[in-house]
Design a protein with these regions (language model features):
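Short glycine-enriched nucleophile-adjacent loop
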Residues: 157-168, 174
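Flexible "cap/lid" loop of the alpha/beta hydrolase fold
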Residues: 165, 174-203
Length: 327
């Protein structure tokens, strides 16, 4: 591990050998008969326990009314609250179990389904990053949580940035994973990646190799064909996927300023984490963010894709925990 100073950001360059696991392509892989074998279940219990006796699937779902929706959520662990905001197409049970176990050892962990996802109702208000931020702040208020550590993954990193800029009093420490500040400052996806995502959302492809290539370096999929995939009973409808895809595209579009120019206002301790091989949100976007947020930390995992927390869960979890303990 090397530590170097770049524009007031602490940059940690970490090289790991990676494992592979996917939790966002379950419906495609369920019907897949190709050369890769994806095994469902929990063969290694030590990696999946949230506490000594309780698994995430068995934690009761609670619901609370926020604005025009009922938000489904789970709470576990003890300590200061940390809110995990899920990315596009992900239900709350998609969080890597090792991360949840690590965090719950000294935090009250809160996971939830975004608007229209899983067990959360869709409501009548239009989908947008701003509305998602409003939903999330309203959720914290409904739970009577004054301030929390906030971790946002992918699309949720956009939401987390909005919350921190508009409601800084609600955020203790900020973790942005697979992030970009959007707009004209965004480093765009390659055209072939845009096409794969568009084809997936519009049901024009069910090719698991193409889909996995957006989330993971494909060579790792091929070299780790028997990884266990966390299974969830929750669903994300095609309508919600399209809505989330559209709000992602709106955030990434070059015809607005994004929030890059506003990030210097953030004074919260901030960790930005990415994989060097992330093609869904190119890793260069993370460097832009840490150059804007004073004193922020950047962790780049060599060879990691957008789904790096599934590729190397224990190391990802330790990085997050170390930041929370020292920042």
């Amino acid at each position: 591990m090397r530590r170097i100073r770049v524009n007031d950001a602490l940059v940690l360059i970490i090289t790991f050998s990676l494992l592979i696991i996917s939790s966002i392509t379950l419906s495609i892989i369920n019907n897949y008969s190709g050369p890769y074998k994806f095994v469902y279940g929990q063969p290694d219990q030590k990696n999946f326990n949230i506490t000594h006796s309780q698994n995430i699937q068995n934690i009761p779902i609670k619901k609370i009314h926020v604005g025009d929706i009922n938000i489904a959520y789970k709470v576990f662990g003890k300590g200061k609250p940390i809110l995990l905001i899920s990315g596009s197409g992900l239900v709350m049970d998609a969080w890597e179990p090792s991360l949840l176990k690590e965090l719950s050892s000294n935090h009250t962990v809160i996971i939830f389904d975004n608007r229209g996802v899983g067990n959360t109702t869709i409501g009548i208000k239009p989908f947008s990053i701003q509305q998602s931020a409003t939903d999330t702040v309203g959720f914290l208020d409904a739970l009577k949580i004054q301030k929390a550590d906030v971790l946002g993954f992918s699309m949720a990193s956009f939401i987390a940035q909005e919350i921190t800029l508009l409601h800084p009093e609600k955020v203790n420490r900020l973790i942005l994973y697979g992030a970009t500040c959007g707009g004209e400052g965004n480093i765009p996806q390659a055209p072939q990646v845009v096409k794969i995502l568009s084809d997936l959302v519009n049901n024009r492809t069910q090719d698991p190799e193409k889909i996995l290539s957006v989330t993971f370096p494909l060579e790792w999929v091929k070299s780790h064909p028997n990884r266990t995939i966390p299974e969830s009973k929750e669903i994300v409808t095609s309508n919600t996927l399209k809505q989330q895809f559209n709000l992602n595209e709106a955030w990434l579009a070059p015809n607005w300023s994004g929030v890059c120019s506003q990030l210097s206002k953030i004074s919260k301790p901030t960790l930005v984490i990415t994989g060097t091989e992330d093609v869904a949100v190119p890793a260069a976007n993370s460097l832009i963010i840490v150059e804007k947020i004073p004193g922020s930390w950047l962790v780049q995992i060599k060879g990691g894709g957008h789904g790096l927390m599934y590729q190397y869960p224990e190391q990802f979890s330790k990085i997050v925990k170390a930041f929370l303990e020292t920042a």
